[in-house]
Amino acid sequence: MSGGDGRGHNSGAHNTGGNINGGPTGLGGNGGASDGSGWSSENNPWGGGSGSGVHWGGGSGHGNGGGNSNSGGGSNSSVAAPMAFGFPALAAPGAGTLGISVSGEALSAAIADIFAALKGPFKFSAWGIALYGILPSEIAKDDPNMMSKIVTSLPAETVTNVQVSTLPLDQATVSVTKRVTDVVKDTRQHIAVVAGVPMSVPVVNAKPTRTPGVFHASFPGVPSLTVSTVKGLPVSTTLPRGITEDKGRTAVPAGFTFGGGSHEAVIRFPKESGQKPVYVSVTDVLTPAQVKQRQDEEKRLQQEWNDAHPVEVAERNYEQARAELNQANKDVARNQERQAKAVQVYNSRKSELDAANKTLADAKAEIKQFERFAREPMAAGHRMWQMAGLKAQRAQTDVNNKKAAFDAAAKEKSDADVALSSALERRKQKENKEKDAKAKLDKESKRNKPGKATGKGKPVNNKWLNNAGKDLGSPVPDRIANKLRDKEFKSFDDFRKKFWEEVSKDPELSKQFSRNNNDRMKVGKAPKTRTQDVSGKRTSFELHHEKPISQNGGVYDMDNISVVTPKRHIDIHRGK
């Protein structure tokens, strides 16, 4: 198949990060507090109460929070021990202002390692590492409207290369290299660190209150924020109820809807406060229904992008297969080392057991040698018989110990043999997967390689594209095929451009299109389809290979190419 005019990983995506420029798709956006998706802050009213070191006004709570404190500015805040940078804290609904405590502590080693793993470079747009999973039923079991917020803070210097404190006072945004946002995968909402695409977040100034060390701030999606700068108190790394640590933290594509429930800003403080700028991310906890909605949207956008970018999908699958093969090779090497060590220990324990058995056999032979003196306690040989018996007892104990050690070594050798066999089998599977992925990539990449147009096309009438939205679409007109046949093209994109240019030059075909579409075709762009035929951002007619290139279908064979609408193109590749 072949996509429309979109290029790059983000051509089929949309922006979901309210008021965050360069959101999930890297395209930029300026949505408000509500993005119309049902995932925005309007579904989770601001309120009071308390949580784990983060509070919405007064009250006392559980976890790391608790207590009341009134700021001179008239808002309530908690000056409890703050959560460590990079660790999530809960903020429960309540009286209208969100309170957080921040410190000057450095990143923990675990969070620093996550940042190091996201240095890139990354292919295929944004990548992320999920840190924590969210269990909404544990956070608000009875009333979904009482869902808490999840607040994560980081030193601003860890997410941006810009010296925030030196920016002009009217600077509205700052470019960041990493963000903490929500992602949805495996039917759960997660908190993740995301990197890999140009992004920017608002910069806001913290305003002092009458209480020393307490400031006010606000940013899109977070209308009222009280920030307590805590010094001299230990930070907490205990996860709040309803938040679990994700295991196997590895970098994966972040998807298209990441950040849909998160609101972020960099807060800078007055110079005299001594507090360095802090990055803050506030995430709305989604209900299970909202998570499913996001998951379905993510799948739809991913499938839409996959359909429009077969080469990139093949490359991504090959990269993944190659990474899996590399890991399989490491597993084999590790298990080979384990087996070699197990064999060495097994042979050593066997030698020790053989020696112990020989010692026991010698002791038994000595007993037999002096056995005739067993009933003659006064004879000199009786003492020799007793000594031989004592030797045999000691030898038997040694044999028992050596046998236990040998049995353990034999079990480890057996387990190591099984583990190595399994690792070798897995590697064989990964080798086959990598081979298949490479073959498919090589075939799909043909569309990026030069080629000569072939094929005769078919006669068409004045309703040429009426069938573009059904079956296999409309054929290449024979008149256009005659113009393009035997011509060399640098790539299939080059062919597509020349195809539409020739259509614009044909008097009978061009009059079937509007003036705007003719203007598009004259410069090699595909004409726009009707509204009911579009799919997301795919709004132009597309060229489809009836026999897929991955199955050796001809890239430039015009008898293998048809014109289809975006909607029909997707349905074809879904087998509909």
Curated annotation (Swiss-Prot):
Gene Ontology biological process terms from the UniProt entry: defense response to bacterium; killing of cells of another organism
InterPro entries in the record: Cloacin_colicin, Colicin/pyocin_DNase_dom_sf, Colicin_R_dom, His-Me_finger_sf, HNH_nuc, Pyosin/cloacin_T_dom, Pyosin/cloacin_T_dom_sf
Record-annotated membrane-spanning stretches: none
EC code: 3.1.-.-
A cellular component annotation (GO) from this entry: extrachromosomal circular DNA
Gly residues: compositionally biased ranges: 19-35, 46-75
Binding of Zn(2+), residues: H544, H569, H573
Biased composition (Basic and acidic residues): 424-447, 535-548
Listed Pfam families: Cloacin, Col-Pyo_DNase, E2R135
Residue numbers spanned by region Disordered: 1-75, 421-478, 506-557
GO MF terms, alphabetically ordered: endonuclease activity; metal ion binding
Biased composition annotated in UniProt, kind: Low complexity: 36-45
Keywords carried by this UniProt record: Antibiotic, Antimicrobial, Bacteriocin, Endonuclease, Hydrolase, Metal-binding, Nuclease, Plasmid, Zinc
Annotated family: Belongs to the colicin/pyosin nuclease family.
Function, in words: This plasmid-coded bactericidal protein is an endonuclease active on both single- and double-stranded DNA but with undefined specificity.
Name of this protein: Colicin-E7
